[in-house]
């Protein structure tokens, strides 16, 4: 993932604006996410870039994505970009489950230099 391609992703606000499925559920879960002051301080102490690959119809994305989006809201040094799986095969194909499956959601965490530091790909059977 290059910095230039990462920058082409949607912000969470832009993602929410284009949602046709599950928008209300996403917003409810985001609002219901409870964060402690320790949670907020931990994320503010980091300089991260977070890549999310999803689709609005994906129920599995409703499990972790709203909470993560809420967590980074108040973190000025954390940048999250969202890519729709079906519209961005070049991005999706870099993060295939077991090198074969276009499983979503995908969350990839980078440091400020775009070095990958962590990755989560949905674990349900493909």
Model-derived features: positions:
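Non-globular targeting/processing and membrane-anchoring segments
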Residues: 1-49, 70-79, 85, 92-103, ...
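Short glycine-rich or small-residue beta-strand-to-loop segments that form or flank ligand, phosphate
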Residues: 49-55
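Short, solvent-exposed coil/turn elements at secondary-structure transition points
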Residues: 56, 86-88
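Conserved redox-active cysteine motifs that mediate thiol-disulfide chemistry
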Residues: 56-63
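Short acidic/glycine-rich loop or secondary-structure boundary segments that cap or lie
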Residues: 60, 90-91
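Histidine-anchored nucleotide/phosphate-binding helix
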Residues: 65-69
């Amino acid at each position: 993932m290059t910095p230039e391609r990462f920058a082409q992703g949607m912000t969470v606000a832009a993602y929410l604006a284009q949602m046709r499925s599950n928008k209300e559920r996403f917003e409810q879960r985001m609002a219901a996410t409870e964060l402690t002051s320790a949670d907020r301080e931990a994320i503010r102490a980091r300089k991260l870039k977070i890549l999310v690959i999803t689709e609005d119809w994906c129920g599995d994305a409703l499990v972790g994505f709203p909470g993560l989006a809420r967590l980074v809201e108040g973190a000025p040094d954390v940048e999250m970009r969202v890519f729709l799986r079906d519209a961005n095969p070049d991005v999706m194909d870099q993060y295939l489950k077991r090198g074969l499956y276009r499983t979503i959601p995908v969350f990839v965490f980078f440091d400020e230099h775009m070095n990958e530091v962590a990755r989560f790909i949905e674990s349900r059977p493909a």
